[in-house]
From Swiss-Prot:
GO CC annotations, alphabetized: cytoplasm
Organism: Shewanella sp. (strain MR-7)
Designated name of the protein: UPF0235 protein Shewmr7_1261
Recorded superkingdom: Bacteria
Family: Belongs to the UPF0235 family.
HAMAP family tied to this protein: UPF0235 (MF_00634)
Length: 96
């Protein structure tokens, strides 16, 4: 599976998460996954909540349109973004 897939207007992201980073950013490819660094620690769902908020802001969608399909408790996640209004340049290049 590739890191980024457009499927029926939704975006599927195969992510590798780096919690407790110095800043929030989309790092780039990490094998077959897209590496995303976030500042939140992986405690009590804080990293997942922060990831959802960060992705919602990056794709200009409400947090309710960001769904973690797989990997709630791990670093490897499959995330669906429903009808993104914006696609960051780092991800747009992977779609082509």
């Amino acid at each position: 599976m590739s890191a980024v897939i457009m499927q029926q207007g939704d975006l599927l992201l195969n992510l590798y998460i780096q919690p407790k980073a110095s800043r929030d950013q989309i790092v780039g490819l990490h094998g077959d996954e897209l590496k995303v660094a976030i500042t939140a620690p992986p405690i009590d769902g804080k990293a997942n909540a922060h990831l959802s908020k960060y992705l919602a802001k990056a794709f200009k969608v409400p947090k309710s349109d960001v769904h973690i399909l797989k990997g709630e408790l791990g670093r490897h996640k499959l995330v669906r973004i429903s009808a993104p209004k914006n696609v960051p340049a780092e991800i747009a290049t992977l779609l082509e």
